[in-house]
Amino acid sequence: MLEDIERIKENDYDYYRYLYLGEAVGLGNNVYNMSTFHAIETLPSDDKLIGISFALDGGHQQSATAVCAFGITAKGKVILLDTWYYSPAGQIVKKAPSQLSQDINSFINRIVDKYKVPVLQYTIDSAEGALRNQMYLDFAIRWHPVAKLKKVTMIDSFQSLLAQGRFYYLNTENNKIFVEEHKMYRWDEKTIKSDNPNVIKEDDHTCDTANILY
């Protein structure tokens, strides 16, 4: 516990002040301190990848669907390996759940074949029933539905990981959308001082995958 506190103090002093000293911390209305997102070009040679966790945020008629592959290392780091992203915006014919199921399964197989480590978990927003059922029907992949809690509670779990200096992402074209959405992720100023602050629900699909990871 003391080691975790010291790690947070070293990696994200603002979050340490907020969490342990009870001080007001100014990030404006930005949710995350982007200096805690560490880009890497290759996987670390001294910290073995032991498994992969997939997290899925399902979209609807006008909303994007995102799947992120998070690698877990022996030393407890979390590395974003790859991102699959589909947006129906501006498309006359939207993809059906049966088509999304095929695309996502191909993404999963490509990642597993590349890294050759076990899949530790599949997590999905509990509201996304159609795609979850479709993937079980097509491939017997059982996604674990995660009920959404208060937004601030879900964000805190990922924020703690960031503050401990344990989050990394491969600096690839596919992962740019993850970084950009987290840069733009903001609290709604109308709710920021309330008992239940909420975020602005725009272009936040990869953010939601990170929020349901744990």
Q: What do the predicted segments below correspond to?
A:
Residues 1-59:
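ATPase catalytic-site recognition across NTP-hydrolyzing enzymes
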Residues 20, 67, 122, 182, ...:
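A residue-level signal for conserved active-site and pocket-lining positions in enzyme catalytic cores
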Residues 57-59, 127, 210:
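Anionic group-transfer/hydrolysis microenvironments
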Residues 60-64, 76:
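Coil-to-beta-strand transition motifs
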Residues 64-70:
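Short beta-strand scaffold segments in enzyme catalytic cores
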Residues 77-199:
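Mg2+-dependent endonuclease catalytic cores in nucleic-acid-processing enzymes, primarily RNase H-like
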Residues 196-214:
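Acidic, Mg2+-coordinating catalytic module of metal-dependent nucleases/exonucleases
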